[in-house]
């Protein structure tokens, strides 16, 4: 969408027919339109490229701004005809430039919206250096199916604003019970949802499918993407030589979310980890997701044979979306070999079933950051194409970097080494000099400024949160007392101790 959004189009959305319907060649059913949501007039205010996003519960009008603009900021103000606004009691014409002076992020600036000389809305204008998103729905948001919504996005990275339709649903398993929910978004070309719409947001991939991660049990609001960044920095996979644009991890961008006119807090807007992200071959690639703990997940045994289903003993078939028994053959054969083969069979066959270099990197990764929930569950296992071995990548990395904020991790020792039966057998049988390969690879990774690079990325993320004022808003919204500087210090200290311990562990055991 053009970043200079057309005001007349916005007026049509807001002040159009009383009972609008949207007709397409594929559907004659009445569809919801933007004005069904009945946007408060404040959402039509634009400053430069960005929409003002309304939090009507707290009477806040959020506006994104780049850090390079906050000194002596002059903004071009736009709003529809038949309205008027004042900023600090100064009357502002539409399309007028207004001198805000030096912007203090998070500090309220009084703004009033008038119609027929009557004040209809009285807000505090809040500038933030984070990208901002507003999602408004007609219906309650469910786990499934996606419900119709309209969405406004202020994208700081691209200096663009977007207005579009989207389907939204609650995401996750256990996390669905948290008060702060995660969501899946699918951008739609129109209100019917028949055709999707791709956008390249925040310098990330061009796609229609996005994940809003609430990061609720991670009190640093940083660990998930920090872990993904770390994995991406050194992960190997056999197919990367053929697919230079493949990403072995999600990438994400910190945003502030307003959901149905109420501030919802700090989120990470993430790419999906799927066939497209990994650049697996259409038609011959395979992608499995591990969703729950089982003997099969840990390569310990097989309780049942896979059937014509998308699910098998803790695994979910994500691609292809075809419930066929033969799609389970590669992962079944791997579990069967690891769990039941004698040593000779294991030595002779394991390297034809898995990408051992990738497996080495994955084991080093989950132990470097102590990913306590990713040694079996919370993995993706993929095949690039027929004839290629399986490889591993991670997702859902909130229980990492010393996160003890759950009943599952509160008592976990910081010296725990994560493994499963696959890694145990690789080590015990020393497959093709596995131990020396692990040691050599770790020396390469650790000596390449691993600690300082992670700390640098963590500082970037925490500083963005603190500078924006979102730290206070997040605490107020969810009745928390998070000290983000304390979280920064904790993770930094924890990581230094963990990496030193793990380095000694490798030296002594490999």
Report each predicted region and the residues it spans.
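C-terminal motif of bacterial Sec signal peptides marking the signal peptidase cleavage site
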Residues: 14-16
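Internal "kinase-insert"/substrate-recognition segments embedded within catalytic cores
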Residues: 186-194, 198-217, 221, 233-238, ...
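Short, flexible loop/turn elements at secondary-structure junctions
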Residues: 137-139, 155-157, 170-172, 187-189, ...
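Beta-rich interaction/scaffold domains
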Residues: 18-130
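Sec-dependent signal peptide recognition
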Residues: 2-10
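A short glycine-rich, hydrophobically flanked beta-strand micro-motif that places a catalytic Asp/Glu
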Residues: 146, 250-256, 375-382
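Conserved NTP-binding catalytic cores of kinases and kinase-like/nucleotidyltransferase enzymes
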Residues: 62-79, 87-89, 115-226
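Middle-to-C-terminal accessory/interaction subdomains
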Residues: 164-166, 174, 178-179, 322-376, ...
């Amino acid at each position: 969408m053009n970043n200079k959004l057309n005001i007349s189009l916005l007026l049509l959305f807001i002040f159009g027919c009383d009972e609008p319907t949207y007709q397409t060649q594929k559907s004659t059913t009445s569809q919801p339109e933007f004005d069904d949501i009945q946007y408060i007039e404040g959402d039509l205010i634009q400053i430069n490229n960005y929409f003002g996003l309304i939090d009507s519960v707290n009477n806040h009008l959020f506006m994104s701004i780049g850090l390079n603009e906050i000194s002596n900021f002059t903004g071009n103000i736009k709003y529809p005809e038949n309205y008027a606004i004042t900023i600090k009691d100064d009357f502002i014409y539409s399309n007028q430039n207004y001198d805000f002076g030096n912007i203090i992020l998070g500090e309220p600036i009084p703004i009033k919206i008038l119609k027929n000389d009557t004040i209809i809305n009285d807000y505090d204008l809040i500038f933030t250096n984070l990208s901002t998103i507003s999602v408004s729905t007609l219906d309650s948001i469910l786990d499934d199916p996606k419900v119709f919504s309209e969405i406004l996005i202020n994208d700081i990275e691209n200096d663009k604003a977007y207005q579009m339709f989207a389907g939204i649903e609650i995401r996750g398993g256990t996390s669905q019970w948290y008060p702060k929910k995660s969501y899946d978004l699918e951008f739609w070309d129109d209100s019917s949802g028949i055709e999707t719409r791709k956008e390249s947001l925040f310098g990330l991939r061009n796609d229609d499918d996005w994940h809003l991660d609430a990061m609720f049990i991670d009190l640093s609001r940083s660990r998930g993407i920090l872990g993904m960044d770390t994995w991406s920095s050194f992960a190997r996979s056999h197919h990367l030589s053929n697919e230079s644009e493949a990403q072995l991890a999600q990438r994400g961008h910190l945003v502030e979310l307003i959901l149905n006119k109420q501030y919802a807090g700090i989120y990470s807007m993430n790419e999906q980890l799927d066939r497209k992200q990994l650049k697996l071959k259409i038609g011959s690639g395979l992608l499995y997701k591990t969703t729950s703990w089982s003997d099969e997940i840990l390569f310990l045994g097989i309780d049942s044979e896979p059937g014509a289903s998308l699910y098998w003993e803790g695994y979910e078939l994500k691609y292809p979306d075809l419930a066929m028994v033969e799609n389970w053959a590669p992962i079944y054969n791997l579990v069967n070999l690891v769990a039941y083969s004698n040593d000779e069979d294991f030595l002779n066959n394991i390297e034809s079933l898995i990408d051992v270099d990738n497996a080495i990197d994955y084991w080093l990764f989950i132990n470097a950051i102590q990913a306590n929930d990713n040694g079996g569950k919370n993995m993706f296992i993929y095949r690039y194409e027929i004839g290629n071995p399986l490889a591993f990548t991670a997702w859902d990395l909130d229980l990492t970097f010393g996160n003890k904020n759950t009943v599952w991790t509160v008592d976990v020792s910081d010296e725990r080494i994560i493994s499963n039966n696959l890694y145990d057998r690789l080590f015990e049988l020393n497959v093709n000099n596995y131990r020396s390969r692990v040691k050599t690879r770790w020396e390469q990774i650790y000596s390449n400024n691993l600690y300082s690079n992670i700390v640098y990325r963590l500082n970037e993320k925490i500083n963005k949160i603190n500078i924006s004022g979102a730290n206070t808003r997040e605490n107020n919204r969810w009745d928390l007392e998070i000290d983000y500087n304390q979280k920064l210090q904790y993770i930094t200290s924890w990581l230094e101790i963990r990496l030193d311990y793990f380095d000694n562990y490798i030296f002594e055991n490999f």
